[in-house]
Amino acid sequence: MGMFSNLKRTSDIEESKDTLGGFILESDIYTTNIVTAYSDFFKSGAQYINVKFLVTKPDGSTQNFNERFTITNKQGSIFYVGKDGKKHALPGYEIMDDMCLLTTGKTLAEQETEKKVLMIWNSNEGKEVPTEVDCLVDLFGKDILLAIQKIRRNKQVADASGKYIDSKEEQFLNQSRKVFDAEYKATVPEIRTAERNNVAPEATFINKWLAKNKGVTLDEYKEIISGTSAGFSGSTGNANGASAQTRIFGRRAS
């Protein structure tokens, strides 16, 4: 049984919908290779997956991009209850589940892990050190298209009590917003629709995302009058006459 088998999406958690919503990358959709992916826990007890990507930029050069995707809260739940009163998967879980489906044909809950030693940053030593971690090995080396957003926020600093709060200083960072299939350029919802209708996926959301977000910096910076304020919290017919069925996720599981 895999370490994510208890994190299955139940029927009362809403399916995702396509909504627009090192060096800093400009907002764009990038051809991306998954170098490594491993799971660990924050001190709070929340579980995350750290993914190292190799991003190909428009000029053909490549850049490493690391991101942590929080897949549970500290109670081990994969969902939150939205303003609509419905359960929604955590954004980090949603992206990782889509990433797993698009690259392996299996959900995050179906992924197996292997212990491997990776070079991981150790804050106490101030450098990367060999560390044994639980790796999602089936993701290693797989390609995806990743919608990356450039964001402007307040830089957070520790106050006297050690709590992190917003400062006046601005910072720019990148966050993954959506995952697209490298072959079809389609999202998981688009592929699900195609499979239900036994047709090839129609990739339309990718152009909508680009039209709204390409080159746009999402400004979440808050003006601070004096001192610091409370921290910002926030961080996709066969031969025998039977009808053929388009199974994109299924064939990637083999």
Identify the residue ranges that each predicted region occupies:
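Short beta-rich binding modules
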Residues: 1-254
